[in-house]
From Swiss-Prot:
Pathway involvement of the protein, from the record: Protein modification; protein ubiquitination
Effect seen on changing V82F: In GAN1; no effect on binding to TBCB
Organism: Homo sapiens (Human)
Alphabetical list of PROSITE patterns matching this protein: BTB (PS50097)
Gene3D superfamilies, alphabetized: 1.25.40.420, Kelch-type beta propeller (2.120.10.80), Potassium Channel Kv1.1, Chain A (3.30.710.10)
Gene responsible for this protein: GAN
Protein name (database record): Gigaxonin
Modifications after synthesis and translation: Ubiquitinated by E3 ubiquitin ligase complex formed by CUL3 and RBX1 and probably targeted for proteasome-independent degradation.
Record has Repeat as a keyword: yes
Length: 597
């Protein structure tokens, strides 16, 4: 018998679910009861078992009897109302979430092992994070292992501490929780006085009970950042401050130290969004390097120097670099012997150390790497013998790799970015042909969809996603005129998800359209995107250029020494100011001015 063609009906699953839902509403074909708080809900065992691994396990270990009795599934810790909402979700894929019910739904989804529902709850919680609730959401997320939500809530707390410290939630913290919060290195306060004043407000909220915790809580204060004249002024005006300073011996009232002694004890709060470069090759010898450096364009605008960080465990070139959840991840690439690698490493900016990661399923170089909610997606590339279309995903919390659907085509040296929790693959080439096509991958449906193509076909470009926008910078193509094979730098392009089309950016001040320019990375920080590469301006080479999204204009960064490296991997990474300060001291990047008497 001849083989036929496989055909499918896209509405088949939806129709089936609607029919099953109507059976449930009419209590038809039900063969079990859920028992919650003494109330029974008729259900179909096979549907619940398919949806919930927890119920499936209960059925496997306690199978129905053949005596004709109604099978009962007892559940504790879930209310009838919430369970009905979850049953509606199981049969429709939709659920109503609000701030009053979200905690109960997460608890139920956690018990029933409904991972898809838990993911929807996480996305809802992400949109709820605010000054009034970020500490509570942070604690809740930690308890239920909602890792990405916990990271976002912590990041919000660090960034908006002054707003958070004025809320009722902050004033109701336990002494232990308060101490944990004010111990965070990255609190964005500018001056330690704001942390001190937050603690004063907390004590004053219930003075008689909290006085006994005064000394313990104040031990978490970074007293080196408190000005003695400010403290003396507060003591004159506030009896509570007088009592606290008298009780806590660690709070300084003497004149601050000067010179080297001051630097040795100084510990600045806050963080800096840094441009990090990793690996690549030495410009002169062309040997792969393990070097890692960072530059903080907003930390010290007048001193934009490169700070040396801990090097990789091995030299890498043509590797993938990405920051996620406060860490930096590096995978694949090639070593000094041009051997294609599958290994990976993770950088912890708090410890300034690297640790090894489980290797990728396939060794590859010149591949794409993007991140969505703590999941790292590795796309395409080459393995030294052939071009790859495979995709795999690394969960940074479970430390496991899973295979994903293949790319629909080879995109040699294409560019990739994430935007609105979807992955975009752009440009690239294969067998001498360059592409302008763009495809979008939705991890939920695991489907690739073609979208509006780029205005210019290109390879070797870099891309990034910011909010609802995609940016593609640089890349090269052959000149489309009688001059034939000469390569030129492509114009940068911009895509907005609402308008669904690509628009040229003004690249006049990025680089000249010659083949001598190469881009290595595009790093979004604040309201700007920093493009890193060998950027030929016509008169000299720049290593970093700033693109201001609000005005669509390019700007020089402060004067930088010419880089001795090329083809580096690039990313943005949030690093604590106190760590950067120590590194700058160790590397002699600070100089003390001693005023003559």
């Amino acid at each position: 018998m001849a083989e036929g063609s496989a055909v499918s009906d896209p509405q088949h699953a939806a129709r089936l679910l609607r029919a099953l839902s109507s059976f449930r509403e009419e209590s038809r074909f039900c063969d079990a009861h859920l028992v919650l708080d003494g109330e029974e809900i008729p259900v179909q065992k096979n549907i619940l078992a398919a949806a919930s691994p927890y119920i499936r396990t209960k059925l496997n270990y306690n199978p129905p009897k053949d005596d004709g009795s109604t099978y009962k599934i007892e559940l504790e810790g879930i209310s009838v109302m919430v369970m009905r909402e979850i049953l509606d979700y199981i049969f429709s894929g939709q659920i109503r979430l609000n701030e009053d019910t979200i905690q109960d739904v997460v608890q139920a989804a956690d018990l029933l092992l409904l991972t898809d529902l838990k993911t929807l709850c996480c996305e809802f919680l992400e949109g709820c994070i605010a000054a009034e609730n970020c500490i509570g959401i942070r604690d809740f997320a930690l308890h239920y292992c909602l890792h990405h939500v916990h990271y976002l809530a912590t990041e919000y707390l660090e960034t908006h501490f002054r707003d958070v410290s004025s809320t009722e939630e902050f004033l109701e913290l336990s002494p232990q929780k308060l101490k944990e919060v004010i111990s965070l290195e990255k609190l964005n306060v500018g001056n330690e006085r704001y942390v001190f004043e937050a603690v004063i407000r907390w004590i004053a909220h219930d003075t008689e009970i909290r006085k006994v915790h005064m000394k313990d809580v104040m031990s978490a204060l970074w007293v080196s950042g408190l000005d003695s004249s400010y403290l003396r002024e507060q003591m004159l005006n506030e009896p509570l401050v007088r009592e606290i300073v008298k009780e806590c011996s660690n709070i300084p009232l003497s004149q601050p130290q000067q010179g080297e002694a001051m630097l040795a004890n100084f510990k600045p709060r806050g963080y800096s969004e840094c441009i990090v470069t990793v690996g690549g090759e030495e410009r002169v010898s062309r040997k792969p390097t393990a070097a890692m450096r960072c530059m903080c364009p907003l930390y010290d605008p007048n001193r934009q120097l490169w700070i040396e960080l801990a090097p990789l465990s091995m030299p890498r070139i043509n590797h993938g670099v990405l920051s996620a959840e406060g860490f930096l991840f590096v995978f694949g690439g090639q070593d000094e012997n041009k051997q294609t690698l599958s290994s990976g490493e993770k950088y912890d900016p708090d410890a300034n150390t690297w640790t090894a990661l489980p290797p990728m399923n396939e060794a590859r170089h010149n591949f794409g790497i993007v991140e969505i909610d703590g999941m790292l997606y590795i796309l395409g590339g080459e393995d030294g013998e052939k071009e790859l279309i495979s995709m795999e995903c690394y969960d940074i919390y479970s430390k496991t790799w899973t295979k994903q659907p293949d790319l629909t085509m080879v995109r040699k040296i294409g560019c990739y970015a994430a935007m609105k929790k979807k992955i975009y693959a752009m440009g690239g080439g294969s067998y001498g042909k360059l592409f302008e096509s763009v495809e979008c991958y939705d991890p939920r449906t695991q489907q690739w969809t073609a979208i509006c193509p780029l205005k210019e076909r290109r390879f070797g470009a870099v891309a990034c996603g910011v909010a609802m926008e995609l940016y593609v910078f640089g890349g090269v193509r052959s000149r489309e005129d009688a001059q034939g094979s000469e390569m030129v730098t492509c114009k940068s392009e911009f895509y907005h998800d609402e308008f669904k089309r690509w628009i040229y950016l003004n690249d006049q001040n990025l680089c000249i359209p010659a083949s001598s320019s190469f881009v290595y990375g595009a790093v979004p920080i604040g309201a700007s995107i920093y493009v890193i590469g060998d950027l030929d301006t016509g008169t000299n080479y720049d290593y970093v250029r700033e693109f201001k999204r609000s005005t669509g204009t390019w700007h020089h960064t402060k004067p930088l020494l010419p880089s001795d490296l090329r083809r580096t991997g690039c990313a943005a990474l949030r690093i604590a100011n106190c760590k950067l300060f120590r590194l700058q001291l160790q590397q002699g990047l600070f100089r003390i001015r001693v005023h003559s008497p």
